[in-house]
Amino acid sequence: MKPFMDADFLLQTDTAKTLYHEAAEKMPIFDYHNHLNPQEILEDRQMENLTRVWLGGDHYKWRAMRAMGFSEDLITGNADDYDKYLAFAETIENAIGNPLYHWTHLELQRYFGITTPLSRAAAKEIWDEANAKLQTKEFTVRNLILNQHVSHLCTTDDPADDLHCHLALQLSLIHISEPTRLRCIS
């Protein structure tokens, strides 16, 4: 049986595999849309746990959790971080075919080296392994960005946000270009 989301995930032809592995895989990433908080990049925040990484500001994940019927307390409310994570694990387990399913597992593999599919049954093991890594120096916000070879990233800020973090990032020693990109929701 083929491994779950292996190095050739989504690469179905020999040409695709050659183009990706011999060219694109080594190229720097130009991240034109993300949910990263410029303040957390500036401060080089050390995330407390996987819930803070995944559910701190991602409306796509929140929407999926709402569609699963979870209470707002388990999504953006004051519930315990582990309980929020378990709700997200159950959501992902039921999201096969949704891009969130693939994104979640790519993040687990690329950042944490975890190849076990996220589910309620595997949640505790994944939580413990990922959180142990999040407490190391290699897993600060800036190091996570740099270790993925990001050369440019554009945050999606609120039009009313103060841009002082962007200016400070441009003047800091971080070696990525970080222009502001505003996204208006109508």
PLM feature spans:
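Short amphipathic alpha-helices and their capping/turn segments at secondary-structure boundaries
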Residues: K17-E25, L163-L173
